[in-house]
UniProtKB/Swiss-Prot annotation:
This is Ubiquitin carboxyl-terminal hydrolase 36. It comes from Drosophila erecta (Fruit fly). Residues 749-758, 805-818 have a biased composition (Acidic residues). It is found in: Nucleus, Nucleolus. It catalyses: Thiol-dependent hydrolysis of ester, thioester, amide, peptide and isopeptide bonds formed by the C-terminal Gly of ubiquitin (a 76-residue protein attached to proteins as an intracellular targeting signal). PANTHER family: UBIQUITIN CARBOXYL-TERMINAL HYDROLASE, UBIQUITIN CARBOXYL-TERMINAL HYDROLASE 36. Required for maintaining multiple types of adult stem cells, including male and female germline, epithelial follicle cell and intestinal stem cells. May function as a transcriptional repressor by continually deubiquiting histone H2B at the promoters of genes critical for cellular differentiation, thereby preventing histone H3 'Lys-4' trimethylation (H3K4). Controls selective autophagy activation by ubiquitinated proteins. The gene is Usp36. Interacts with atms/PAF1, but not with CycT. The modification Phosphothreonine is found at residues 660, 664, 784, 825, 846. InterPro entries: Papain-like_cys_pep_sf (IPR038765), Peptidase_C19 (IPR050164), Peptidase_C19_UCH (IPR001394), USP_CS (IPR018200), USP_dom (IPR028889). Residues 779-788 have a biased composition (Pro residues).
Amino acid sequence: MPVSMAVCETANVVNAALRESLGGNSSAAGSSADQAKSGEESNGSLQNHIVANAKRILMAKIEYEEVPNYHESVLESLKSKYIVIKPGNPGAINGFGGKNNTGKVVGANGHDNNGARKQAEHPNNQSHHNNHNNHPHPTSNPNELPKPKRVLYPRENIRIGWKQSERKWQVGTGMINVGNTCYLNSTLQALLHIPALANWLVSEQAHLENCNVAESGGGCIVCAMAKTLLATQSNQSAVRPFLIYSKLKQICKHMVVGRQEDAHEFLRFLVEAMERAYLMRFRNYKELDQLVKETTPLGQIFGGYLRSEVRCLSCNHVSITFQHFQDLLLDIRKADTLEDAFEGHFSRERLEDMGYKCEGCKKKVSATKQFSLERAPITLCIQLKRFSMIGNKLTKQISFKPRIDLSKYAARSPAAQAQPLTYRLVSMVTHLGVSQHCGHYTAIGSTDTGSYYNFDDSYVRPIAMQSVCNTNAYIMFYELDLSQTASPAANRPNGMRLTNGHSTTPVPATTVSSPSPTRFIGPQLPPGGVNGYSNGNAQKTAIQFKQHHQQSQQNGFQLGTGKFQDTAKPPLVGAHAKGEANPAPTANGNKSSSTSSNNSSSSNHKSINQQQYLPISSEDEDSEDERTSRPSTVQLPSMPKMTDDHTEKPKSPVKIQAKTPIKTPLKSLVPYESASEEEEAPLPNPRKRRSGEDSSESDQESGQTNGHSKTNGSLTNGSASSSVHVNNSKLKTDAIDEIFKSLKKSADSDDDDDEEESSIQLTNGWHPQKQSQSQSKAPPSPKTPPSPAVIKSKTGIWKVTRNDEVDDIDDDDDEEEEATVKIQTPSKTHRNPFSSSKPSTDSPATPGAKRQKLLNGSPVKSHQQPRVGNGYQSEATSNGSTINELLKQSHRGYGSSVLSWNGKPAELEKETFELVCAKRIAGHGSVDGSDIVESSVAVNASSGSDSNDVVVIAVALLVDAREQRQRDLDDDEENEMDRGRQRKVKSGSAKGNNASNSTPGYNPFQEYEGQKRWNKNGGGGGGFPRFYNQNFRQNFQQRNKFKFNRFGGPGGAKFQQQRALQRHLAAGGGFSRRQPSAQQQQQQS
């Protein structure tokens, strides 16, 4: 071992004697030197001085110590004076001895350097003392992370991921709780399901065989962990972790067997015990410095380094230090997500005012402090601060994602920028309870197949990813995801082999490159570019694109836009063309040029295909979905070019009429779809159809919205003549109104355009209303969609219809009405339910045949006056199957009725028979329905119908009106039970075996509210109302005793008949037309 004495250069006795002899008398020494050089005089006087001084020096006691080399003896003491280097000093040599603005020579840390001028005058002397700065050494640059002198376990030997091991990994068995050891079981399960740690433990087979630590026959703590891992992999039943449980006192002295402990505290002591056990393999482990001790396998797996920058607010002096960590403790008091907690941890914080002593100012000043990742760990351990010092627990829900990216928290150093920072969730520890001293710990771990399992002591069960993300986590383990950060060898010569934090300078990403000579004609997309964005290198992966994008944002660069066009073409100019690259339009797909709801289905399919190449993460997609931007679609040479104009017509080979721009994006509250799966047709706006005028006779094709018609995913001008006028009224921005777009057409009074009229196929048996010229001055009537909306839900496909339609019961003689109106009906095809069809000729047909054609989808002409029924129109004549078809399409008994799309009843007038009926259904008008009868008689007087038919119609309308009022007044708790997803079955009695003895209005869903069963003496109440019937429970009577007073008071077969009809309809059965009894005719008359 080399020896260096404490006196350094004076160790040589001869040299010391010479210096002391010559230094005693400068003049004599100078003359003696001259005499010695010239050789003219003898050197006797010099010898005398040397002998005298040598004797004294040899007799002096010299203290020395053994050191490895000269640097650690002398230069290590000097290193403490130059810990901090002042950045941005161009005049400094190697960061030392530079001049500041005032001309004062300062050191690297901002202090006065008295020896700086001397070192500058004697560069050789400086290079001698600072020789260690001229070659790689732990103190090469204090602004960089120092390298350890010795690496105990190379970082490159850590195998990341389950696939890196040749072993076939199993899910693992549970662990038996031997008495308040759930914290130990859950911590062990979380650790053993970390791939990097499990692979290292399996690789310690040689140490297991030769372990010389005999502690209770189980070896060291590392051997105990490895044996526990092998036991969980090989056994079929739950194991007892006695090897770890027996060493609890060795792991932590203050932990008591059988007492509940904190899982994170046990985790920290367990990892430290494993590190100590590994260091004991080396003889001089106590003499190792801290940097070397941090290179153990546990330190390489869990260890990382944080860069701490403290900036003085007075002189802007920055003090940089590095801190080793094995877990991040995140404060969640002001965070709702894991990203918020990271933002708070790595944000710049202000220290206590006048509480930091600046090394440059030499006084206490205000300063700021900020952390950044200098070297990220392979396995990131995150502990959420849920417990306080007194044991209270913060039980708030913190949402997190299975994959996180920490690249924005990396330090601004080359070594930090070159490392991968994409992590995936591998295991976690959860706590159930209200405090630290009680509760239960469980663990969640991943397997080599990517699935997750919940480990609750000895119970092991699979768990879904959604449940994992909704877990109230306490400790989380994320591991580097090499599959997401793998890059070509051109940028990283060593592949993904992790260095010790000091790798070569990464190749800078180029954002502009020469265009590819190949021009793609088809809809293909290269891996490098999406939606007009391209990083100029087709062989780079998606994660590289994101990293380059983030770096370009920091450096102020902008990504180029190729768009499969020639280089001479200008780049895309949009809302995102600013000082930084913004791939927001790529996240939410391609939008239409007017940002309206008239998006073609082809662009929607294109956006779905393009999202497969998106280079940004899912969280960016979620946040960017709400933005509205100009189009950034890929323009191919074979595709029509569209401009970014929002108001004018785009220049395109296809005639396109872009109109009605909407500033707010279209957001659907429910997934409405048309009857065809291939295209989505816009639905009318209820506010527009209330405020707009009636649609008169026009010669345009159906399915047009604001003058367009959807044809094969593109907007084409589908109007047939110039008589179509688009109403440019103000668009409504209500949330519900955004779902619909109405068709407003002005009235056209020409009678000679019968040959140009297009008959439209009936959808679900409904006709849109069309009034004749004589009724053109009538008050506006509602405009209705051709077909009910189709809703896709988890329970199936639903159609939204009204449950209070008008049940028409007319005879076959009503086909001879005077008012002949030609109805325009939408034709439904397999491609577009709103597309038009050729005009059909007028052919008379019987009502039965006409109804059959309507049901089969054939376009016909209607010669009858259409009737309005609560916002929908139906034909005036029908056969006996009309009501059955209506009842089959209705949703009676499925919940509360839908009055209109905005929740309000339709505003209809009373001037026609249909409007009066709608008022009846909405609950207006007289109680006995006399005005309905009068209106029906007045309307049908000219048709020559029998009075019996009129009475039948009036009775049916009155019954339906009463049913609607009854449904509107049902208890809220009945409607809130299932929200219409399950059909309510109303049986007649407690046993439900006799429909004749059924109690009106009884609902089995309300049985849980009653405490006693009603009597079984059954039977109806004769002529008494329901609240006089003794078969009802008292609480049921109390809630419903005021509901039926407005039906005419007690008594009467009229009430019983009405209730019987309601029970029949509620049971789901249809009913055929029946002749009214004489008693009913007498009551109605």
